[in-house]
């Protein structure tokens, strides 16, 4: 069986209705990255950061994987597929893909950077 590595980014999720970060009118136009996507931003205003990501999680409830997600999952019938994605949603998983690497993490899986007993603890 052949191996396939597939790279995906914002366009894949945008087709499902997920807001992008960088496009005109995207999330970074409304929220400076320093305020909601850095440890310093969290230290300054944890409520803003938590609300920002909770809104992203809420958006996931209203969208479904698109045909592109489904086609990638179907490739697993004939290939060993690894999807490497910049997206932080779980649409690849929901479409049925089983080997996904989220380069920037995933909204539905969070961990504390302050919990030394957490296996994902960041020092």
Regions found by a protein language model. Give the residues of each.
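Conserved catalytic core of sirtuin-type NAD+-dependent deacylases
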Residues: 1-123
């Amino acid at each position: 069986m052949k191996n396939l590595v597939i790279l995906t980014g914002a366009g894949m999720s945008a087709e499902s209705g997920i807001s992008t970060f960088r496009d005109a009118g995207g999330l970074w136009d409304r929220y400076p990255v320093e305020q909601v996507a850095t440890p310093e931003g969290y230290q300054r205003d944890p409520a803003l950061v938590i609300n920002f990501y909770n809104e992203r999680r809420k958006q996931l409830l209203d969208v479904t994987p698109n045909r592109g997600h489904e086609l990638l999952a179907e490739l697993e019938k004939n290939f060993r597929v690894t999807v490497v994605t910049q997206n932080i949603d779980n649409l690849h998983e929901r479409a049925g893909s089983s080997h996904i690497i989220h380069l920037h993490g995933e909204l539905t899986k969070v961990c504390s950077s302050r919990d030394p007993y957490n296996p994902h603890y960041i020092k």
